[in-house]
Amino acid sequence: MEIYKKSEKKNDMPDDSVPYLMFGRTRDEVVQRVSEDIMIASAFSPTHGVMHASNVSLCDVWRRTYSDDSRHVIRSFCEMMNTVVGSMPGGEPPFRLAFENLWWPGLRLSDESDYRLLESNLEFEDWCICLDTGHLMNLLPDIYTEKDGVDALLDIFYGYSRDLVERIRAIHFHYSASYGYRSTFEERSMDCDAVSFIGSAYPHVSMIDQHLPFSEPRCVEILDVLEPDIVVHELPGNEKGPLEDFVKQRTLIG
């Protein structure tokens, strides 16, 4: 899976940045890198390991529409993961793999179609979904407030089938009400080298993906509907301290 199009080769990635920013230049390099990362992590016996089942071409990072197709991304992701896991003992990963949604092409979870495609193409059993509430809000229109986001997510989650709900074993819990920014930011072409362009995109992505703590009591209904085993309060903290956002959100759950 490419992080940029062939037309962008003039802004090629330096060799020492490739493993960290795009896993590899070729299919075999990507498979090797992901395999090594999983085996390194297995030494810690984690309950699960999270991977974003998505891809964005570098030229699309500062755009509202994307050149990649979600179904193609999911199929390519499954092919890669099947190759990675197929070489492991018993054809299963050493710990459960949790595939996370993003607003970029790939696993989005605004309905069941992405999940069904993932389910039908993966050839191993020990996997689950890690649903990121803020990432899903970043995909939806008209999310100006926390309440907008909570209401929109619950409308989606109440439409999930039971087997999808049971596959969601972890949640990254936070909100993002960034539609005002998403609908007005100035689009930008890739106008510098790849590493510099990625660096310049971090503030932009942070404006989209806000990782704010819930204060709306109805957010608890999200957990009641999805019944995850693990809830990660994925929050950065604020000027008062690194745990302030966590405490604010955690008190809502009881």
Protein language model features and the residues they cover:
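Active-site-proximal loop/turn and secondary-structure-junction residues that shape catalytic pockets
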Residues: 1-3, 53-57, 101-105, 133-137, ...
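Short N-terminal secondary-structure initiator segments
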Residues: 1-10, 73-74, 125-137
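Active-site gating loops and adjacent loop-to-helix segments of metal-dependent hydrolytic enzymes
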Residues: 2-25, 191-202
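Short, flexible/disordered intra-domain loops and linkers
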Residues: 4-10, 59-69, 107-108, 141-150, ...
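Extended interaction regions within the primary functional domain
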Residues: 5-16, 25, 65, 87-95, ...
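Residue-level signal for well-ordered alpha-helical segments
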Residues: 14, 18, 26, 95, ...
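Active-site acidic/histidine proton-transfer and metal-coordination neighborhood
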Residues: 19-128
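Histidine-acidic metal/acid-base catalytic patches
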Residues: 31-47, 124-131, 137-254
